[in-house]
Curated annotation (Swiss-Prot):
Extracellular topology ranges: 136-608
GO biological process: fusion of virus membrane with host plasma membrane; symbiont entry into host cell
Residues the record marks as carrying a glycan: N141, N173, N179
Name of the protein in question: Fusion glycoprotein F0
Taxonomic lineage from the root: Viruses, Riboviria, Orthornavirae, Negarnaviricota, Haploviricotina
Length: 662
């Protein structure tokens, strides 16, 4: 059995010669493999195999290890009479071993994959933290030059508003007490006519001159482009807002039948608030100003009061209501088409029923307070009905949409002293951040409430790269300007600390009655409780908290930006000085060009004059050299010795061949 093992292992290694080697790290296994290699080398030398003769020793050692592993596996296999049966069990055992190795490698692969996943997530987290840190405003560096963040709010935009119509009946239905109040109602109608007729005339003029645009063709394509046209000749002078509002008025007055049915309903109604649903499924709220007073006060008192007293009470009530109408619709008398009425003024016309109106309109939620504070609800007069004495208002109430991730920051600048000059850093009053991006923020169309900035349009616009570097902490990129007069903040309270320019205002410690001095080399003074718990500054006594800012900021440690001018007069003066200096520089450049041209010409003439004697001297030197060389050659020829033809040399002792050659 032992002799058959090498044969089987040899057969196995021939079939598995393409399997990659499996190196081992154990010392004993290496020694055993070397011994096995030494014992089997003689057998392999007797059987020459061309496939293994040229292979390296490492391959042979790996084959030896595979034989050893196979021999260990064969020890657990029962002995069979037939040797071929033994060989048939070898691939099965090997496959089991391979499966066991794969099963052992699978959890390792899973662990390595999880490690790679965590590594990638960690890298992404660090990258996001790096970007966020780069994107954040560097408040510490900005505080050294007097820039302090005072507030940050969310950014919301008013989207396209929803429109709804509100009908206000200006005269109550007093049919039950008509006999006692006929005179008072007549006088009140005259007052209403003096208010409503100018508005009605302006609305009628605009709506009559806005007509449907008739299509020139009869085809479907031409009819699709039909709209409205404005008769500009009849209007005379009209602003863009009036023209736009006039077209809206025309569109709201197209359904005259609905207005007629509304008039009939209001004449028969005694309810103060009534919801009338028209065919267009638009909710119209009808409000009668003094109807509740008539129904709840005057009608029940008819049995206890005289008819004259009832009329007087109704007259006083109507006169008060008329005064309120004048205060509300006064701007509409001057511009009845494009004038807007705020919700705060409209509450008087609604008789104090603002909560019921909001409930009828279905407007509720956390944004209602913000809209009321921002005066987002607007109304316009769209129709005046003189016979029925009612007006129709178009209410537009917006929907707020918060822009996720955008934070609006408010910046305040505190002045600082450099020697005897007082400076302050010029930065925008509001900026916005969104991740890595920093942008300018135009607050002209925005209203700031407790936690939000509500804007009627997009207020974000790009910021210059230089200003972005300033906001991110590069103080050398922050421009500064001189303080003119009393402009600029001398101190500010931030994080419980006082950031003050004690060189320009008096800073006093109220607790110890000592003056807080600021040395000339300091820019600002940061006062906390460790310096003085109770500070008197600029006439105000402030109790400060723990230290949140550095004790002092020295001028030498801060890189200050360039100096600029913001005042119009200063800008104009500086611009004029710059232009004057440019003109002077141009004159100097022209004069320098003339001097250079003169020097160039003079240098050319001097060079030409200097070249003549140099060439003459060179020619004379060459001639002199030639003459000297010729004379030297002649002297050499004269000194040469001449041979006498009669001279015969002594040839004694010379060979005959040499003599013959001579």
């Amino acid at each position: 059995m032992h002799r058959g093992i090498p044969k089987s292992s040899k057969t196995q290694t021939h079939t598995q010669q393409d399997r990659p080697p499996q190196p081992s790290t154990e010392l004993e296994e290496t020694r055993t493999s070397r011994a096995r290699h030494s014992t089997t080398s003689a057998q392999r030398s007797t059987h020459y195999d061309p496939r293994t003769s040229d292979r390296p020793v490492s391959y042979t050692m790996n084959r030896t290890r595979s034989r050893k592993q196979t021999s260990h596996r064969l020890k657990n296999i029962p002995v069979h009479g037939n040797h071929e049966a033994t060989i048939q069990h070898i691939p099965e055992s090997v496959s089991k071993g391979a499966r066991s190795q794969i099963e052992r490698r699978q959890p390792n692969a899973i662990n390595s994959g999880s490690h790679c996943t965590w590594l990638v997530l960690w890298c992404l987290g660090m990258a996001s933290l790096f970007l966020c840190s780069k994107a954040q405003i560097h408040w510490d560096n900005l505080s050294t030059i007097g820039i302090i963040g005072t507030d940050n709010v969310h950014y919301k935009i008013m989207t396209r508003p929803s429109h709804q119509y509100l009908v206000i009946k200006l005269i109550p239905n007093a049919s039950l007490i008509e006999n006692c109040t006929k005179a008072e109602l007549g006088e009140y109608e005259k007052l209403l006519n003096s208010v409503l007729e100018p508005i009605n005339q302006a609305l009628t003029l605009m709506t009559k001159n806005v007509k449907p645009l008739q299509s020139l063709g009869s085809g479907r394509r031409q009819r699709r482009f039909a709209g409205v046209v404005l008769a500009g000749v009849a209007l005379g002078v009209a602003t863009a807002a009036q023209i736009t509002a006039g077209i809206a008025l025309h569109q709201s007055n197209l359904n005259a039948q609905a207005i007629q049915s509304l008039r009939t309903s209001l004449e028969q109604s005694n309810k103060a608030i009534e919801e009338i649903r028209e065919a267009t499924q638009e909710t119209v709220i009808a409000v009668q100003g003094v109807q509740d007073y008539v129904n709840n006060e005057l009608v029940p008192a008819m049995q206890h009061m005289s008819c004259e007293l009832v009329g007087q009470r109704l007259g006083l009530r109507l006169l008060r209501y008329y005064t309120e109408l004048l205060s509300i619709f006064g701007p509409s008398l001057r511009d009845p088409i494009s004038a807007e009425i705020s919700i705060q003024a409209l509450i008087y016309a609604l008789g104090g029923e603002i909560h019921k109106i909001l409930e009828k309109l279905g407007y509720s939620g956390s944004d209602m307070i913000a809209i009321l504070e921002s005066r987002g609800i607007k109304t316009k007069i769209t129709h005046v009905d003189l016979p029925g004495k009612f007006i129709i208002l178009s209410i537009s109430y917006p929907t707020l949409s918060e822009v996720k991730g955008v934070i609006v920051h408010r910046l305040e600048a505190v002045s600082y002293n450099i020697g005897s000059q007082e400076w302050y850093t010029t930065v925008p009053r509001y900026i916005a951040t969104n991740g890595y991006l920093i942008s300018n923020f135009d607050e002209s169309s925005c209203v700031f409430v407790s936690e939000s900035a509500i804007c009627s349009q997009n207020s974000l616009y790009p910021m210059s790269p230089l200003l972005q570097q300033c906001i991110r902490g590069d103080t050398s990129s922050c421009a500064r300007t001189l303080v003119s007069g009393t402009m600029g903040n001398k101190f500010i309270l931030s994080k419980g600390n006082i950031v003050a320019n004690c060189a320009s205002i008096l800073c006093k410690c109220y607790s110890t009655s000592t003056i807080i001095n600021q040395s000339p080399d300091k820019l600002l003074t940061f006062i906390a409780s460790d310096t003085c718990p109770l500070v008197e500054i600029d006439g105000a006594t402030i109790q400060v908290g723990g230290r949140q800012y550095p004790d002092m900021v020295y001028e030498g440690k801060v890189a200050l930006g360039p100096a600029i001018s913001l005042d119009r007069l200063d800008v104009g003066t500086n611009l004029g000085n710059a232009l004057k200096k440019l003109d002077d520089a141009k004159v100097l450049i022209d004069s320098s060009n003339q001097i250079l041209e003169t020097v160039r010409r003079s240098s050319f003439n001097f060079g030409s004059l200097l070249s003549v004697p140099i060439l003459s001297c060179t020619a004379l030197a060459l001639l002199l050299l030639i003459y000297c060389c010729k004379r030297r050659y002649q002297q050499t020829l004269k000194q040469h010795t001449k041979v006498d033809p009669a001279f015969k040399p002594d040839l004694t002792g010379t060979s005959k061949s040499y003599v013959r050659s001579l």
